[in-house]
Amino acid sequence: MRVVLFSSQSYDRGPFEEANKTFNHEIIYHNFSLNKDTVSLAGKAQVVCVFVNDQVDADTLKALAENGVKLVALRCGGYNNVNLKAASEYKITVVHVPSYSPFAVSEFTVGLLLSLNRKIHRAYVRVREDDFNIVGLLGCDIHGKTVGVIGTGKIGSNVAKCFKMGFGCDVLAYDINPDKKLENYGVQFVEQNEVLKKADFLCLHCPLTPSTTHIVNSDSLALMKKGVTIVNTSRGGLIDTKALVDAIDSGQVGGCAIDVYEGERNLFYKDLSNEVIKDSTFQRLVNFPNVLVTSHQAFFTTEALCSIAHTTLKSASDFYTNSLDESVIANK
């Protein structure tokens, strides 16, 4: 069958071609995003494959349905960029990759926190410029500190265990469906506000839903310890960026490391080095010396890309043989 990938990059082709040796689909790669203006370029696809910043809204889904598309496959875990209600109305099934490599994201989370705390990214730049002064690079021991984890799916659980067992931290966690197995590792489940109030380091690992949108806002920031460090490798919309900027400016937040941003659709996965970025909130954020921003790369490992490709193409095959695994369906 014909599978059309939107927002594909050079690094997607290898894993998809390798995985396709098992499934034998016809794959077409587009390096531009899917939206209502590019949807016609899906052509006669039977499966449309999209990524985190493709705009799969009602208009786009309507056009896909009119062209006979029955399956939209996300090559990522989240699906907040897809109008699931509209997809169901147009009888389009939406699948995602619920667990491609939880180690990739959890390891990156720990790396961000360590880099921010010990100013490793700034030290690297200094030494490259023959500046060997360490003034301004002071960090703190993570050992013995309290790490708060909101969201204890596979990624959040890995992060919680890493900080508890690897660094000797006190770990407080919150989840609407707590994984009680984590208690065997010494992780303590408490209410969300208690996590916010007690955490020295706060890690966000929950999906973006109406109830979690701007979970970090002016009110929740006011509850936190003065000087808290926040790490977000989940979804940008979990944080009200303007409120975060104000909290950093006032000193309420001591540092922030993010791999996602609520306005990233117009920024990430693009080379804008010769352009003026007109997002003033983002520009203000990245100019703080105690902020570390990466462009949604926490997932980006060889193992994760291979897993994503295999799961995506398997879902395409399974859909058309009526053997699709329920766990990958987003609009059940």
UniProtKB/Swiss-Prot annotation:
* Natural source organism: Schizosaccharomyces pombe (strain 972 / ATCC 24843)
Q: Which GO CC annotations does the UniProt entry carry?
A: cytosol; nucleus
Tagged with keyword Plastid: no
Q: Where is the active site?
A: R235, E264, H296
List the subcellular locations: Cytoplasm; Nucleus
Tree of life domain? Eukaryota
Question: Which residues are NAD(+)-binding?
Answer: K154, I155, T233, S234, R235, D259, H296, Q297, A298, F299
The protein's name is 2-hydroxyacid dehydrogenase homolog 2
Instruction: Spell out the family assignment given in the record's similarity comment.
Output: Belongs to the D-isomer specific 2-hydroxyacid dehydrogenase family.
Q: What is its main location?
A: cytoplasm
Question: Which Pfam family is an annotated match for this chain, by its short name?
Answer: 2-Hacid_dh_C
What PANTHER family has UniProt attached to this entry? 2-HYDROXYACID DEHYDROGENASE HOMOLOG 1-RELATED
Q: What GO molecular function annotation could you give as one example from this UniProt entry?
A: oxidoreductase activity, acting on the CH-OH group of donors, NAD or NADP as acceptor
Q: Which InterPro entries match?
A: D-isomer_2_OHA_DH_cat_dom, D-isomer_DH_CS, D-isomer_DH_CS1, D-isomer_DH_NAD-bd, NAD(P)-bd_dom_sf
